[in-house]
Amino acid sequence: MAPAKEIWAVGRRKTSVARAKIKEGSGKITVNHKDIKDYLQNRKAIIEEAVRPLSLLNVLDKYDLNLNVSGGGITGQVGAIRHALARAICRIKPEFRPAVKKEGFLTRDPRMVERKKYGLHKARRGTQFSKR
C-alpha cells in the first residue's frame, strides 16, 4: 500500500501562526506534540471552534492532524488553527472549497492590535481633559 499523502497548510490570526499537517487516518489531533484536549485545557467550545471546518464537512474522524502553533494567546491560536485546517482540507479535496469558503473559514481575519501612539496612554486613550 502506498503511504498516505501529507498536506501542509499555514493559518494565521492576530500574531499567531499555525502550521497544519493533515493526512488520512482515524481522527487523531495533536497540537505542539500534545493532544488537542490537553493543549486547549479541555475547553469544549474552544476545541469545537478550532475543528469547525472539519466538523462542518463531517470528516473529523477521517484525517489525522499534526499542528504546530506559535505566538499570541488562546483565541489567536484557535483562529490560526481553524484557518490552517480550512486551507489544508481544501488542498486535499478541492470539492470542499465552496462550502468552506461560504462559512468564511478561508478568509484571513485582518484585525490586529492597534499600536500605542506617543503622547497617549494607549492606542487611542488620551489624558483626561480638565476645563479648570
From Swiss-Prot:
InterPro entries: Ribosomal_Su5_D2-typ_SF (IPR020568), Ribosomal_uS9 (IPR000754), Ribosomal_uS9_bac/plastid (IPR023035), Ribosomal_uS9_CS (IPR020574), Ribsml_uS5_D2-typ_fold_subgr (IPR014721). Pfam families: Ribosomal_S9 (PF00380). The keyword Ribosomal protein applies. Keywords: Ribonucleoprotein, Ribosomal protein. Transmembrane segments: none annotated. One of its GO terms (cellular component) is cytosolic small ribosomal subunit. The keyword Cell membrane does not apply. It comes from the Bacteria. GO terms for molecular function: RNA binding; structural constituent of ribosome. GO terms for biological process: translation. Gene3D superfamilies: 3.30.230.10. Disulfide bonds: none annotated. Belongs to the universal ribosomal protein uS9 family. PANTHER family: RIBOSOMAL PROTEIN S9 (PTHR21569), SMALL RIBOSOMAL SUBUNIT PROTEIN US9M (PTHR21569:SF1). This is Small ribosomal subunit protein uS9.
